[in-house]
A protein has these predicted regions:
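Short amphipathic alpha-helix used as the core "switch/output" element in two-component signaling
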Residues: 42, 64-74
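Hydrophobic/aromatic residues positioned on beta-strands within the core alpha/beta folds
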Residues: 82-84
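Two-component/phosphorelay signaling modules centered on CheY-like receiver
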Residues: 15-32
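Alpha4 helix (beta4-alpha4-beta5 surface) of REC/receiver domains from two-component response regulators
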Residues: 65, 86-101, 114
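Receiver (REC) domain active-site loop signature in two-component systems and cognate sites
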Residues: 58
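Acidic catalytic/metal-coordinating carboxylates
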Residues: 35-39, 62-65
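Active-site beta3 strand of CheY-like receiver
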Residues: 47-53
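A Lys-centered signature of the CheY-like receiver
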Residues: 105
Length: 121
């Protein structure tokens, strides 16, 4: 199944983050949002995005587990990790699994827009 060229998936259990992405990018991109890792994997399978902003700490299936499954299944999607807690070993592991960037919360809107524009243009 082909991905939509401007589709972004945002995965975060914080509704405020999801709302921020909607305000920031909703008028320019096809945003799909979810608050859990299991739903994220289902969306990636059925409505493949080109870019995923993925929170690390979530109940159930966390962001690192989602990233590991994506790589195991050889899904070709760009992933940007977003997190409130920075640990160098987590960043290294995420990047070794193919994450293209690692952003700290609170998110820098200029950086989010730059990444979306760079990947989706």
């Amino acid at each position: 199944m082909e991905h939509l060229s401007k589709r972004i998936l945002v995965v975060d259990d914080d509704q405020g983050i999801l709302d921020s992405f909607e305000v920031l990018l909703g008028d320019r991109y096809d945003l799909v949002m979810t608050d859990n890792g299991y739903e994220a994997l289902r969306i990636i399978e059925t409505k493949p995005p080109r870019l995923v902003f993925l929170d690390i700490k979530m109940p159930g299936l966390d962001g690192m587990d989602v990233l590991k499954r994506l790589r195991k299944d050889q899904k070709k999607v760009e992933v940007v990790i977003i997190t409130a807690t920075h640990r160098e070993e987590t960043e290294r592991e995420a990047k070794s699994l193919g994450a293209i960037d690692f952003l700290m919360k609170p998110l820098n809107i200029v950086e989010v827009e730059r990444i979306a524009s760079q990947i989706l243009s």
